[in-house]
């Protein structure tokens, strides 16, 4: 059968961009269909603009610490921050798709090889679904009459609100809570769990939670929102404890929903699982082998870097025979929370290792015991590594300055099944925060030297 294109990609977020740009570079006939903006949520209303906000907020905090709080000195105007964010978006997407035809329309399946958009039908041998997710609004009394902020609208504010309630305690909630607090907004976080960052390392999450509270962020844990209403003064939220919270704005950051309803997946024979994820196998194929689902829509890992990686793997698998295809589940996924301090993790967590009965050792080095961290006034934090019986590196958690860069070394170690001695004999630049990773290996080794038999062996070889 002759097709109009080799490949049609629906959605141009991180996953769709990877598929479309790489496919075109490989000589394939590619058509990309995007409903809104190139870059998807990450580039336009997610990880990229949020880092611009965080950067501005950190500068304000640094200025306050260096100069002292000067009464009446306002934070930088939000419109200047927004202008910078617009500049980032323009620079990021400019000229990227000169060689890839892009159609800005809503797409849906006619059948398993045919996609319709804007009244036109096009066929392809391979089709990639990369539609991502969108923010979930709370289902509480009065919610339909309240204008919630989400990450999709937060960066369009004309000014920093005087106060804001944030529903949720995950990455988006935490990053925006700290950023807006440092920019002069009074923040109250409402979190159903016993702490924020409930999926992360407990010690690291509690360190960040206390840091937030020290900066003036109010955190209500073990609390559920029951009802909400719009008042003349702004927002009134009633919790399950009966407390009434008042603020100028409210941000919903407590969940995500899938964004493929308009695709008519049933026309293509593409199935979803009980949780709504598009069902994929280890090669990222859906229930139709020539249709792939990449990124958030398959529910595997809701991270932009994971989406990009899946796009690359799926494109390779679409071209290769089965025996050469790659299992996307075998690649570790590091994750970083861009709070201050940053929190990064990769591999097995301490909780999972204990729950599965794995025999392992936890090695910890604290920033406060490292001269460079003290000198740079970033002494809050630690590096924690989980080492198996044979010395294999099973996972790592880093909370502190630069952890988002440091975690990549540990991701390579976990994926390649390296042993802690591999890091011990790897020279690290000094004095950098990354040197703390080598300190972990040194600490592990020094503990071995405490054993009497080891000391005897050392003395024996020294006398030869």
Predicted regions span which residues?
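Glycine/Thr-rich phosphate-binding loops of Rossmann-like dinucleotide-binding domains
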Residues: 18, 124, 137-139, 175, ...
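FAD-site-proximal beta/loop scaffold in flavoenzymes
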Residues: 144-161, 244-322, 409, 424
């Amino acid at each position: 059968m002759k097709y109009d294109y080799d490949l049609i990609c629906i959605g141009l977020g991180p996953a769709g961009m990877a598929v479309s740009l790489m496919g075109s570079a490989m000589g394939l006939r590619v058509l990309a269909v995007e409903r809104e903006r190139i870059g998807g949520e990450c580039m336009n209303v997610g990880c990229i603009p949020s880092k611009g906000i965080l950067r501005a907020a950190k500068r304000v905090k640094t200025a306050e610490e260096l100069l002292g709080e000067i009464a009446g000195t306002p934070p930088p105007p939000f419109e200047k921050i927004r202008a910078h964010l617009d500049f980032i978006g323009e620079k990021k997407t400019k000229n990227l798709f000169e060689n890839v035809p892009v159609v800005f329309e809503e797409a849906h399946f006619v059948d398993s090889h045919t996609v319709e958009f804007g009244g036109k039908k096009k066929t392809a041998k391979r089709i990639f679904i990369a539609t991502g997710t969108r923010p979930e609004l709370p289902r509480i009394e009065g919610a339909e009459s309240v204008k919630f902020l989400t990450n999709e609208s937060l960066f369009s504010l004309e000014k920093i609100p005087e106060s804001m309630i944030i529903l949720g305690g995950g990455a988006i909630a935490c990053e925006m809570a700290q950023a807006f607090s440092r920019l002069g907004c009074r923040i109250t976080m409402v979190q159903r769990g016993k702490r924020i960052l409930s999926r992360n390392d407990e010690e690291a999450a509690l360190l960040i939670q206390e840091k937030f509270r020290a900066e003036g962020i109010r955190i209500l844990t073990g609390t559920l929102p029951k009802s909400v209403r719009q008042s003349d003064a702004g927002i009134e939220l009633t919790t399950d404890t009966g407390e009434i919270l008042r603020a100028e704005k409210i941000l919903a950051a407590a969940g995500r929903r899938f964004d493929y309803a308009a695709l008519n997946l049933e026309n293509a024979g593409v199935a979803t699982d009980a949780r709504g994820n598009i069902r994929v196998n280890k090669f990222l194929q859906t229930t139709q082998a020539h249709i792939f689902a990449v990124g958030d829509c398959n529910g595997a890992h809701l991270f932009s870097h994971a989406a990009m990686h899946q796009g690359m793997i799926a494109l390779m698998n679409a071209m290769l025979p089965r025996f050469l295809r790659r299992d996307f589940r075998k690649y570790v996924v590091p994750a970083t929370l861009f709070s201050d301090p940053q929190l990064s993790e990769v591999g097995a967590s301490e909780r999972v290792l204990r729950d599965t009965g794995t025999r392992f050792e936890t090695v910890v080095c604290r920033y406060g015991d490292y001269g460079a961290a003290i000198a740079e006034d970033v002494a809050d934090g630690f590096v924690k590594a989980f080492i198996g019986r044979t010395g294999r590196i099973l996972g790592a958690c880093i909370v502190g300055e630069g952890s988002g860069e440091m975690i990549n070394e540990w991701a390579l170690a976990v994926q390649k099944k390296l042993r802690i001695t591999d890091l011990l004999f790897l020279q690290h630049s000094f004095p950098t925060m990354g040197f703390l990773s080598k300190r972990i290996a040194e600490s592990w080794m020094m503990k071995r030297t405490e054993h009497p038999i080891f000391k005897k062996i050392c003395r024996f070889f020294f006398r030869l």
